[in-house]
Amino acid sequence: MAPRHTDRLVLRRWRIEDREPFAVINADPEVMRFIGAGAVLGRGLSDDLVVRFEREWEARGFGLWALSARGDVDERLLGFCGLTVPMFLPSVLPAVEVGWRLAREAWGLGYATEAARAAVAFGFSECGIEEILSIVDPQNERSLRVCAKLGMTDRPDRTHPATRKRVRVLGVRLHS
């Protein structure tokens, strides 16, 4: 699949050279604070995620894109955004989730919203998905603001089976 472009971003498939900067992102406690149990990931687990992301593209025709700034000749990894099946929360299945994770230096620039809008549009227009969810820690105000900008509304809250913490489930429908 060819890369996609927004006004400021390139949404592309993962490359081997993305693994090192992705491991740095996943080792940042602030980045990981609201993800699962909030634990940082070591290099091996981080690399495993990249493999899983690519397999999801092959199996489903959608997945999580690597993000780079448009015009950055090095295509330095800023993080990821895209669509995935939230297997970690079986109570919402069958479902598709839009998710994102950005390096801290990319926070506050509107990149998550810009990339998530592109991912949701892709899901609706090219994948035939009718509803897209986002599963968010209730204390993650930044991600909740992104969800609001996407027009997402609350669905019933759930309990994360691994952490036993409440998570907010928000969604947007194709024709809403």
What function would you assign to each model-found segment?
Residues 53-66:
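A short helix-loop-beta-strand connector motif used in the catalytic cores of GNAT acetyltransferases and
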Residues 1-34, 51, 66-176:
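Acyl-donor (CoA/ACP) binding surface of acyl/acetyltransferases
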